[in-house]
């Protein structure tokens, strides 16, 4: 059944009672009439609200896969006066049960991104539905089903577009009050109580009929008087219980009875985004947030996941053809030109973007692996050019791909059905590949007859192919007589996903010809030969990192890098499994390495690895480079080669082959 609240009936002669007829007609998308009803109404006052119930037994429910909408035509007749209105609506019921989200009795999982009100041509949001069909359609194309509007409520066109596309929206007031952003906290101003209560009620009244409006938060990262937020939430929820409510987006806090869910980066004091557990995530593909789910009494949504800085594409300056001037990108371009790295910008974008995509995948899969997790919200699929410039997106601020991943590639790990693979990342040839297989299964229908099709490749060669209904793998790696990187693809029906693992041969420790003092360095340059120059003799020692700058190197001042470019074909790396960009086999090496600045226009210095500088620092550095000096060929190595790990042993072996002239 459907409960309809009719429009307020305004009678201009309140002293006089009258009567009229209300006629309801419901049509489907094709215009077919699916329900009709006529009711007599007595009018008593200048304004009244009547309730009517229309049976609609065969109604199709609205959701992300079948966003069915109906049109209600309401006609009121009173004597010779006639008034008529049309309202679009969808049938759906959102609820929480056992700490899970249910839409019409079926569990849903949120895969979201955040809209931070970026409009580079106008400075304000479009008011036509077509523009939002394109903008929101991009999120849908990338496999997402959810958009959170960060500290703002979008216009009618957004809800209409989301209704049509089948997107689950979270809406907020323009409420972002905490001292960290240099504004008062909630309740510091007496006007907060009346203004924000009325704002929340107005949002509910204006947009409440839209089926896409599933979630409401008072605002972003609010601190202060939570009793005021509780009053607002309780009041609005009592009037309109058709959606779910939370006090604020972000900040773990004692949950109140009016809250249906928690959106934060910590839940019950457990992290729910990889930022706070990168070392654990680097060890394997098994990280999840089960402890947070167990200890939190409501569904948990991980807040602002990602925020991995990608080097900016300043070529977008030419695209600002409207009211906005990109003075931030103009400044970035000027700094890059002054530092002599502007011509490398596309290489920097590719390298930093590749790392960001890898880390976004890890963040997303950790959420998908977590049983009964509420979902995640990325920050963000697109760049955010405010707050001192945060180019954290795989798409630019115009919503265009940076060429890092296609939508289809992104959907493989962020869509409604995603195969998952839990295993270590680094093995030796004496071990077995032990892995657990599972399926994140939130498609239109549950997957039947689950079968995993597993293919493991080394380059183009198939190392192993297995079809199994068992969710476990136990594969010997002893047939490999060399170190290798293996690509594991797990397919279930038409859905597939891939991971890279690294297998290191049982390599003995290698002694490297090394110069230890400035005098030894000077001598070999005179006599000739090859030798390793350790970090102690670097002209400067700049710390390296694997995880890129968080959010923005301007907002959070940092000299950290944003990825690394690798000359994988260089002879010094012929024995070390790597591609052109860093993967997890490099994490421990890079985080214990130092680099030196690459001199401008010095062809004697040939970087094998080049750190991608952040756009505020723009200092190109290298932890591993060949330097031709005098008669010598010197291998400057900033890696700590003392740990007895498979990766270090293999890198030393590979470097040793180069220094000995074997490659």
Where are these regions (language model features)?
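Secreted/periplasmic carbohydrate-active enzymes, especially glycoside hydrolases
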Residues: 1, 5-150, 161, 165-166, ...
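Short acidic, Pro/Gly- and aromatic-enriched capping/linker segments at domain boundaries
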Residues: 88-100, 286-291, 376, 516-520, ...
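Extracellular/periplasmic catalytic domains that process cell-envelope and extracellular macromolecules
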Residues: 102-103, 207-210, 292-296, 525-526, ...
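Active-site-proximal beta-strand elements of phosphoester/diester hydrolases
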Residues: 109-114, 300-304, 511-516, 631-639
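Substrate-binding/catalytic cleft of secreted carbohydrate-active enzymes
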Residues: 146-396
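Short, solvent-exposed loop/turn segments at secondary-structure junctions
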Residues: 223, 252-253, 306-309, 382-385, ...
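Short alpha-beta junction capping motif
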Residues: 512-552, 631-633, 637
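Catalytic beta-strand/loop cores that center a nucleophilic Ser/Cys/Thr
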Residues: 537-540, 552-647
């Amino acid at each position: 059944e459907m409960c309809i609240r009719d429009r307020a009936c305004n009678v201009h002669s309140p002293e006089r009672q009258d009567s009229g007829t209300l006629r309801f007609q419901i049509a489907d998308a094709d215009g077919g009439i699916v329900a009709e009803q006529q009711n007599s109404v007595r009018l008593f006052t200048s304004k009244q609200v009547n309730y009517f119930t229309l049976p609609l037994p065969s109604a199709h429910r609205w959701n992300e896969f079948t966003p069915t909408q109906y049109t209600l035509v309401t006609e009121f007749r009173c004597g010779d006066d006639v008034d008529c209105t049309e309202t679009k609506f969808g049938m759906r019921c959102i609820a929480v049960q056992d700490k899970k989200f249910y839409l019409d009795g079926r569990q849903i999982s949120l895969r979201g991104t955040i809209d931070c009100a970026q409009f580079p041509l106008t400075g304000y949001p479009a008011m036509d539905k077509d523009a939002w069909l394109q903008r929101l359609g991009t999120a849908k194309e990338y496999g997402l089903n959810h958009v959170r509007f960060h500290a703002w409520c979008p216009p009618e066109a957004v809800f209409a577009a989301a209704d049509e596309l089948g997107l689950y929206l979270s809406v907020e007031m323009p409420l972002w009050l905490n001292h960290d952003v240099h504004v008062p906290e909630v309740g510091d101003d007496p006007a907060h109580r009346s203004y924000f209560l009325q704002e929340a009620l107005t949002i509910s009244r204006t947009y409440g009929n839209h089926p896409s409006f599933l979630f409401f938060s008072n605002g972003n990262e609010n601190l202060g008087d939570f009793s005021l937020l509780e009053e607002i939430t309780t009041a609005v929820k009592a009037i309109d219980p058709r959606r779910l409510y939370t006090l604020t987006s972000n900040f773990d806090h004692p949950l109140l009875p009016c809250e249906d869910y928690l959106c934060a980066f910590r839940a019950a004091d457990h992290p729910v985004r990889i930022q706070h557990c990168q070392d654990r995530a680097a060890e394997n593909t098994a990280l999840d947030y089960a402890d947070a789910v167990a200890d939190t009494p409501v569904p948990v949504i991980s807040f602002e996941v990602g925020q991995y800085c990608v080097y900016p594409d300043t070529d977008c300056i030419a695209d600002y053809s409207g009211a906005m001037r990109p003075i931030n990108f103009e400044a970035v371009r000027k700094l890059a030109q002054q530092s002599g790295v502007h011509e490398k910008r596309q290489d920097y974008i590719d390298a930093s973007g590749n790392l960001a995509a890898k880390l976004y995948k890890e963040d997303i899969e950790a959420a998908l692996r977590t049983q009964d997790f509420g979902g995640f919200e990325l920050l963000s699929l697109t760049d955010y050019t405010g707050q001192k410039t945060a180019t954290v997106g795989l798409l630019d601020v115009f919503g265009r791909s940076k060429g890092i991943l296609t939508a289809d590639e992104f959907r493989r790990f962020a869509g409604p059905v995603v195969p998952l693979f839990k295993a270590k990342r680094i093995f030796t040839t004496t071990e077995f590949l032990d892995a657990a297989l599972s399926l994140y299964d939130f498609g239109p229908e549950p997957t039947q007859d689950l079968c995993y099709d597993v293919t493991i490749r080394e380059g183009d060669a198939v190392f192993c192919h297995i079809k199994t209904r068992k969710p476990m793998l136990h594969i010997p790696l002893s047939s490999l007589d060399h170190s290798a990187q293996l690509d594991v693809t797990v397919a279930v029906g038409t859905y597939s996903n891939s991971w890279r693992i690294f297998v290191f041969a049982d390599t003995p420790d290698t002694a490297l010809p090394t110069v230890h003092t400035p005098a030894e360095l000077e001598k070999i340059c005179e006599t000739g030969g090859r030798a390793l120059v350790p970090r102690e003799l670097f002209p400067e020692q700049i710390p390296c990192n694997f995880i890129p700058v968080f959010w923005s190197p301007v907002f959070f001042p940092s000299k950290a890098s944003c990825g690394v470019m690798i000359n994988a074909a260089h002879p010094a790396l012929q024995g070390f499994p790597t591609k052109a960009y860093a993967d997890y086999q490099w994490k421990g090496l890079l985080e214990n390495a130092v680099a030196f600045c690459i001199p401008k226009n010095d062809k004697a210095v040939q970087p094998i690895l080049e750190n991608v500088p952040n756009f505020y620092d723009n200092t190109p550095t290298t932890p591993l480079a060949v330097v031709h000096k005098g008669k010598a060929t010197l291998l400057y190595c900033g890696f700590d080669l003392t740990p007895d790990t498979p990766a270090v042993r293999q890198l030393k072996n590979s470097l040793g082959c180069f220094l000995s002239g074997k490659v």
